Amino acid sequence: MKLCNKLSLLIIVSILILQLVGCANNTNMLQSSTQLTRYPIADEVLTTLDRTVTPISVPSTSPKILPGEVSKYSQYGYGKWQPDEGIGFQKRLDIMPSAYTATSVTNTGNLLRFFTMSDIHITDIQSPAQTIYFGLQGQPVMSSAYSAIIPYTTHVLDAAVQTVNALNKKQAFDFGIFLGDAVNNNQFNELRWYVDILDGQVITPNSDPESTASTDYVRPFKAAGLDKSVSWYQVLGNHDHFWSGVYPPTERIKKTIVGDTVLNVGDVVKDSKNIDGTGYYMGVVNVSSEYGKIISAGPEASFTTPPKINANPDRRSVSRNEWIAEFFNSTSKPVGHGFSRDSIKTGFACYTFEPKVNLPLKVIVLDDSDNDNGIFGLKATGANGALDQERYNWLVRELDRGQSEGKLMIVAAHVPIGIGSYMWDSASSPTENTLIAKLHTYPNLILWISGHRHYNSVTALPSPDPVHRPELGFWEVETASLRDFPQQFRLFDIVRNSDNSISIFTTNVDPAVKQGSPAAKSRSYGIAASQIFPGPPLPYAPIGAYNAELVKQLSAEMMAKIKTY
């Protein structure tokens, strides 16, 4: 009996010890989850009205360096910047009657306040099918293939979201809208990181399932998440449904993306048809290296065997339908972020919404990216703007409805219009000229907002009859990329004026990055890329920002309708 009692006591003690150990482990796990890295922004949150980011010129004695020589950036003066004074609003009367003067006109009523972000390009730097190699020589405009900022795309978005939250506390937004190219390579895991950052989830920007790297850019962190009071909406961009933003993913590309071998592809820079060829391995980032060294990239002849990586099925390409579906897998509002559940079945990425109760205004979200069938016009790729008859007919119906219902209208699309024929696919039906001519028949259309070019350009699209029908003119405002310098987003404040015209105030904002943070490092690398890669001059150089008051004439009907706001 004594032996049995001792055994029983021993068993009980053992169970208690195991339970205590389990509790300790659970406590450690809880502490671990609460101690996740966070990247708070700077205490002072300003817009470019107050302060701008001005790049410092590279010393004339510095050598030309290649984009991948990141460790040399600071040594030779690449990527340096300084804060500078802010820039005010430039008052634009381009689409107003020629005799119009705003001398005695005052801003009287606030109608709508919202923000736009675009071209975030969340990038899986360990994917075997990015196009890194084509950007390593610093050729013109090829920073789209590689830039040293690509390991930090998740961190920049997190900083921008926190900046929005701080501005929202000062003056609430009615909504926010993201203008396409949420991701870089049409991958599921890139899309999940994007949505999860906006939802405030834990982000692990490391897609190698066997990696133990702890460099700052792959370390798990807790995203802040967009303030839950702010509704956000989504636009489809070419990178969201095309491989590298240019090609419908072929079966070979789809297989490679989830495989263990780095993509071997032909020189698609010289000839887009080389997508089916071979000759160059695209490379990946060595995430154990401080500066994100590129490995497994170069001519096929330089390798004795194909370079390998660890496969991950979450890197898979997503169709339009699958891309839309992920916006229903979100904890922020609204459900689906503008898309209908029916669009999951159809892949139709157009919709409308009315952001403010009792305000006669609707936003028309238009998918103006090329079709997935890969049938492009001469010299066009999937990076061009286009409509097919279905989307054009839908757009016309929505414009007709908005006009007949007496509502002001904003079109939100990814690709801009009216900036040159090179931007629009010649195979589009309608043509760009036909589209613009149709838009000019709607006096209630006030604004077209877009991204795509990574610029902060503002374009006036004046009425075809400026003397008799000035209200047929409208404005186009582009929002720069969070990936490339100037790494900014935009605020919009639409106000009623004392003469019942309206003014659209648009303001650029730099994410309020904290010194020493990954997002601050990204800003420096973005500036360095703009100094290394030759290309078209940056609009509004050297800061790339542009703030404006855009005045728009309304019809007599709409002037009467909004005069009490």
PLM regions and their residue ranges:
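Short coil/turn segments at secondary-structure boundaries
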Residues: 128-130, 189-192, 247-248, 377-378, ...
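Metal-dependent phosphoesterase/phosphodiesterase active-site architecture
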Residues: 26-168, 174-175, 234, 254-405, ...
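Active-site-proximal segments of metal-dependent phosphoesterases and phosphodiesterases across multiple
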Residues: 373-393, 400-449
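Core catalytic region of metal-dependent phosphoesterases/phosphodiesterases
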Residues: 149-265
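Active-site environment of divalent metal-dependent phosphoester hydrolases
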Residues: 124, 184-186, 240-245, 372-374, ...
